[in-house]
Amino acid sequence: MKPLKRILRILKTISLYALLLIYLSPFFFVLINSFKSRREIISNPFGLPDVWSLDNFVTAFQKMDFVSAFVNSLVITFFSVIGIAVFSSMTAYIFVRTDWRFNKVMFFVMVAAMLIPFQAIMIPLVQIYGGLNLLNSRWILIYMYLGFGSSFAVFLYHGFIKAIPLELEEAAMIDGCSRIQVFFRIVFPLLKPTTLTLII
């Protein structure tokens, strides 16, 4: 049996490496072709370039304004992720730890909002923002990402916060922490797995 298991293990390993090569091959060819001229890409799309050239990268940076696009993506992603993580975790904490009458209703409304596809409200949103002269702005895009990402984030944080023992917060309050200090010093650090999931 041992030789058979060893053969099966080797076959599985070979299959996984073959699958990895298949998945990585498009990225490899894109990278290789980025060093070729247009004529060489058409004539020899799968081979190595005859002359390694950085002209395509220079063109991308100069004509396509790649640096500006990259900075925009970086700023929008950074502030969107930070905003979603902070505001959604605070919202979920309020839903879990307070006994307001409409907490469950508001939570289910937020969860139901995840069912609404972005395509269904994309055109009305563009019309509204266009009427307010808010188009072509980083901050309005961040605001939209906050709105669309918060529902799922609240759903994730809600389940995780319910599993945190209430005694930890009560002990912190006895030591003199306010509700905000309890959240940021006790609860939020315990939410690292959920926060990393959202960031990724």
Language-model segments: which ranges?
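A structural signal for multi-pass alpha-helical bundles of membrane permease subunits
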Residues: 2-200
